[in-house]
Amino acid sequence: MIPETLNPLNYFTSLVPDLMPVATVPIIILICFLFLIWNHEETSSIPGPGYCMGIGPLISHGRFLWMGVGNACNYYNKTYGEFVRVWISGEETFIISKSSSVFHVMKHWNYVSRFGSKLGLQCIGMYENGIIFNNNPAHWKEIRPFFTKALSGPGLVRMIAICVESTIVHLDKLEEVTTEVGNVNVLNLMRRIMLDTSNKLFLGVPLDESAIVLKIQNYFDAWQALLLKPDIFFKISWLCKKYEEAAKDLKGAMEILIEQKRQKLSTVEKLDEHMDFASQLIFAQNRGDLTAENVNQCVLEMMIAAPDTLSVTLFIMLILIADDPTVEEKMMREIETVMGDREVQSDDMPNLKIVENFIYESMRYQPVVDLIMRKALQDDVIDGYPVKKGTNIILNIGRMHKLEFFPKPNEFSLENFEKNVPSRYFQPFGFGPRGCVGKFIAMVMMKAILVTLLRRCRVQTMKGRGLNNIQKNNDLSMHPIERQPLLEMVFTQEAQTRIRVTKVDQH
């Protein structure tokens, strides 16, 4: 028999009780810690997908990258309700489409900051610069007065005549946006008109419309693509190269135009006649109030704003008119009553109620900008939900406009604006301290261009092709997918003062 002291099994069995507690304690602690985190996150009072030990944030951010911001917001609100918690880049993010909550965010200074990828915003020049996505509240406050002054007062009145003139001039040279088969690229036409009007009021130098419009489109694509990308994306140079080049291309073009403006200002005799938006910025730089980078980015953002959003909005309006000729008839009767045979003037604007309601209903039914992105600067409570400092906020105003108040929320109908609509239920431009600084001039521009166009155009639809047939991409904003036949129209002369606009199918 083997002595007990020499039996190797004795050593093995005696070691197991001593080693097991030491080996399992860290594992047990880790499991308990993860369980506590999981249990804490899962019991959040805010509806939304679960945290699931970090898997939830990865999935939600991935959904934004895959579906686009607008589509992802609609998905989460439809799935979980009108106040939803998700994550973007690991940061807690609330998606809100409830009017009372949206009103609270817009109203308070606590939400004047934006959010987005730092590296992405740096690439396009918007990080702590310009006005659109400047997430430095102190610097944004210094920049905003330049935009406010340019977009109000005398500039607001001048823009009406500029829009009328530009629309007429561009209708007289449709061949520049006409294809070989005679179809007109109406979206490109609207972009050219918007760029021309912006240039005449804010910059005032000669430019190549076709080239700049293309550069603006590429810049917007880069902005939309990079806004929420994770940092690792920017470490792979071949992935972001084309976006960096697109941003650099437009910024370089703007630098050249601004230098032309500087040269022009140095030779004029009376500065008062040339004190536009760009001039104010240049003189602010000369005083040391702004840097050259500030000036370049502010001019760039002023020049891209209308071609980026208002052009698509007007394009959609033409499609909606084509789908419902009775709407055109109502507007034409009002236009003839208010204006007669003359062109639209500033005094006419308050009297064009049907035209105004049509614009509002178009923006409600098919918004181009249907979300607003903000960041909480301090802890807060919104409709009973706690909001921590640094929380991202996305206001899904496009969905909000179809949930409350309107009698026919899912239809395009002028009846939705026959009665006065309380501001809390309809905010296409936002309001409050960070509301759209150009909302008043935007309405003036859309009215002036639409009225001038309708006085010369009749809009008809062929083969029942409507807005629902057009493929759209809903990311940072809603844009029709380019290069599809339904984006083209045929303009044929019908009478001396009117042109027929016919939407066609190339197939």
From Swiss-Prot:
InterPro entries the UniProt entry points to: Cyt_P450, Cyt_P450_CS, Cyt_P450_E_grp-I, Cyt_P450_sf, Cytochrome_P450_Monoox
Keyword Transmembrane helix included in the entry's annotation: no
Top-level enzyme category: oxidoreductase
EC number(s) from the headed UniProt entry: 1.14.14.14
Sites where the protein binds heme: 436
Gene Ontology MF terms: aromatase activity; heme binding; iron ion binding
CDD domains membership: CYP19A1
UniProt membrane topology term: Peripheral membrane protein
Keyword Metal-binding annotated: yes
Subcellular location: Membrane
UniProt catalytic activity: testosterone + 3 reduced [NADPH--hemoprotein reductase] + 3 O2 = 17beta-estradiol + formate + 3 oxidized [NADPH--hemoprotein reductase] + 4 H2O + 4 H(+); androst-4-ene-3,17-dione + 3 reduced [NADPH--hemoprotein reductase] + 3 O2 = estrone + formate + 3 oxidized [NADPH--hemoprotein reductase] + 4 H2O + 4 H(+)
SUPFAM superfamilies xrefs: Cytochrome P450
One CC-aspect GO term: membrane
Keywords tagged on the record: Heme, Iron, Lipid metabolism, Membrane, Metal-binding, Monooxygenase, Oxidoreductase
Cofactor: heme
Pfam family, any one: p450
GO BP, sorted A to Z: female gonad development; lipid metabolic process; response to estradiol
Protein task: Catalyzes the formation of aromatic C18 estrogens from C19 androgens.
Family assignment from sequence similarity: Belongs to the cytochrome P450 family.
Protein name as annotated: Aromatase
